[in-house]
From Swiss-Prot:
NCBIfam families associated with the record: nusB
Family annotation (HAMAP family): NusB
UniProt-recorded name of the protein: Transcription antitermination protein NusB
Gene Ontology terms: biological process: DNA-templated transcription termination; transcription antitermination
Length: 139
């Protein structure tokens, strides 16, 4: 699959996870509704589904990975930043085929696209500290 299709899968995953985090609806329902309502012809849909289910299933674990590196309480974190960080931490911890730098760079780009003005700096700061702990032998 082309890198652009993976990038689009991550973009869609941020949007769907944002919806899931706010609604607390079943992740399968969120996925179904998202795919029914969005144009996903240029999206790696399998990867989108993996990100959604992987983040939803492992959200407590992923939150635990980020907590030591947050400058505020998890509950105070914006929903977009939380979704972006969860995706990146899922890729770093569960998808060894995704290069370390790709996971971080994609998260920064997602934060620039969907987050508040300086959220990409915050996301970069958290991942810059967390990534070497999650993947100690990778750079």
């Amino acid at each position: 699959m082309k890198p652009a299709a993976r990038h689009r899968a991550r973009e869609c995953a941020v949007q769907a996870l944002y919806s899931w985090q706010l609604s607390q609806n079943d992740i399968a329902d969120v996925e179904y509704q998202f795919l029914a309502e969005q144009d996903v012809k240029d999206v790696d849909v399998l990867y989108f589904r993996e990100l959604l289910s992987g983040v939803a299933t492992n959200s407590a674990y992923l939150d635990g990975l980020m907590k030591p590196y947050l400058s505020r309480l998890l509950e105070e974190l914006g929903q977009v930043e939380k979704a972006v960080l969860r995706i990146a931490l899922f890729e770093l911890s569960k998808r060894s085929d995704v290069p370390y730098k790709v996971a971080i760079n994609e998260a920064i780009e997602l934060a620039k696209t969907f987050g508040a003005e300086d959220s990409h700096k915050f996301v970069n700061g958290v991942l810059d500290k967390a990534a070497p702990v999650i993947r100690p032998n990778k750079k």
